Amino acid sequence: MNTQEILDTYQHSIIQIETPLASGSGFYLDKYQLIITNSHVVTGLKKVVISSKDLKRKEATVVYDDPKYDLAFIRTERLELETTLRLSTNRVHDGDKVVAIGHPYGLNYTATEGIVSKAARLQGELEYIQIDAAINPGNSGGPVLNEAGQVIGVNTFIIQNSNNLGFALPFSYVQEALDAFEKLAQDDIIRCLSCLNLVHESDIKDDYCPECGVKIDVAKKRREGYIPVGTIKTLEGILQEMGKDVALARRGQRMWQIDIGTARIEISYYDNGVIVADASLCRLPQENIEELYRFLLEENSKMDYLKFAIDDNSIMLSYIIVDSSLEEKNGAIALGRLFSKADIYDDILIKNYGAIIIKRDD
């Protein structure tokens, strides 16, 4: 298969994975009903958000975390796919053509082709497949496929400032980890970095390995979960009071995204202390723009907290405040108005003024 055929065939098996601390890729193996990714993608957390072409954003549980191999398994319900990925069983050779699939920079489903420049490159104590396909941030955890569409490795890391020099964990390590995990027949398994034993989360006391006594950092992160603090905690508290699912709304630690009707609201907390909540309503029409502008100006004079603005050709309804002024009461009032007004104004602008619905790549 060529690159486009591989992408068309298997893109439904490629999963986007997000935590407040990182984002990356993974791939679904139907045989195990597991999503395979990197340990560093899940950032030690037990709960992550997953999505795909066939899967709406939802929380899922990391059931296996292996810092040694930089592997993690995520449990999900069976995905009904016409064609499913499977691990290769064939030896990889220098010069083999490969395709790396993932979500670079959080974008949807891209594939880059290249070759195996070295089938076994020793890094630390593990052998990796060195490839020259472009691997970008966000590709981590995604599959590297051969020409038959079989998984030969997991995109794991790149060498900074190199010319497309990427490294994939070979399928043999993945298969070894899957076999060991399946043999235990239980979830919530962590590999100790010191003794390399697989231990159950419930057997770990005070975050120390029950086999060798060395502290397991991943155990503490999984137990505590993600804990927002300061202004981020205040913002998320407001959103929760409004009935929003904060875990699904997060886009990193300092940004949240919520869709209300056809409007999309993005809340950003900047390093300078400014909080901006933008509702992207619709696009400017090609006709009757003056009439629309007049309406926006009239509405601006009537509103507290909120203001209309134009960003390129998008009509925005915005709320801006500095963190030192944000309190739960005033924040809840302002964001409540933004959410309700956004749902009303996008309909008015589209129906009465010919504004154009924004097409979104979800």
Locate each region found by the language model:
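C-terminal cap/linker of serine protease catalytic domains
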Residues: 1-7, 104, 151-219
